[in-house]
Amino acid sequence: MPVTDSIADFITRIRNAGSAKNKTTDIPYTRVRENLSKLLLEKGYIKNYTVITSEQFPFIRVELKYMQDGQHAIKEISRVSKPGRRVYQGKDIKRYLGGLGLFILSTSKGILTDKEAREQNVGGEVLFRIY
């Protein structure tokens, strides 16, 4: 069955794997998903990711990160802009949870966090929020 919202699928797979305490999860490959994985790795929400090209289809293996007490590093992750209701933010992007969490945006300069978008003075589509 085809996926209509690949970013929501990406978020759901990570959230479900974290809830099940899985060490890794496999996500079908797209460039956007690879860029999101790279951003989550840079911000410390996942341990690592690897792009695996198999005979059938390429996928991304994401290694999840857990705290010392066994809690998932991602407390909350949810989609903001959806296919039926797009959400855009101008240059004056507000902080999520006073700067504790992040908004992830798709901008003309690529996929950026809210802080990076403010520094580069660009706005864009708010893909999801993470804490």
Curated annotation (Swiss-Prot):
UniProt-listed Gene3D superfamilies: 3.30.1370.30, 3.30.1490.10
Keywords associated with the record: Ribonucleoprotein, Ribosomal protein, RNA-binding, rRNA-binding
Gene Ontology annotations for the cellular component aspect, listed alphabetically: ribonucleoprotein complex; ribosome
Protein species of origin: Chlorobaculum tepidum (strain ATCC 49652 / DSM 12025 / NBRC 103806 / TLS) (Chlorobium tepidum)
InterPro entries linked: Ribosomal_uS8, Ribosomal_uS8_CS, Ribosomal_uS8_sf
Function as written in the Swiss-Prot or TrEMBL entry: One of the primary rRNA binding proteins, it binds directly to 16S rRNA central domain where it helps coordinate assembly of the platform of the 30S subunit.
Name under which the protein is recorded: Small ribosomal subunit protein uS8
Quaternary data: Part of the 30S ribosomal subunit. Contacts proteins S5 and S12.
GO molecular function: rRNA binding; structural constituent of ribosome
Annotated family: Belongs to the universal ribosomal protein uS8 family.
Any one of the GO BP annotations: translation
